[in-house]
């Protein structure tokens, strides 16, 4: 504990590690066609690795040329899972769409699994995973 932590009251929470969740992602197909209305389906499985039930939400962030619907207007999606017990898994399916303005290349999709306390406005911990979608 440093002097700044002592002055400002930052304390380490005992027994709470940073690897609270395990995120597995399967993408079908691995790539989508460029300059066409085409989509890939993400199958996301989140597992609670902690020994207590956690209030859980998942946030998915896409680049500007991809979206969650055919018009690709929304680029971020929050899915409120609810209470996820110890060693429980939750499976979610999401479609990621490319449009006529999607150029060929590799695009990063960011996934965040967050644990909350009280309600969804307070974040206790988060785990991030990045996957790549190829556009050809």
Give each language-model segment a name.
Residues 29-37, 83-86, 100-102:
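Short, solvent-exposed beta-strand/turn "edge" segments of beta-rich domains on protein surfaces
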Residues 100-136:
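Terminal connector regions
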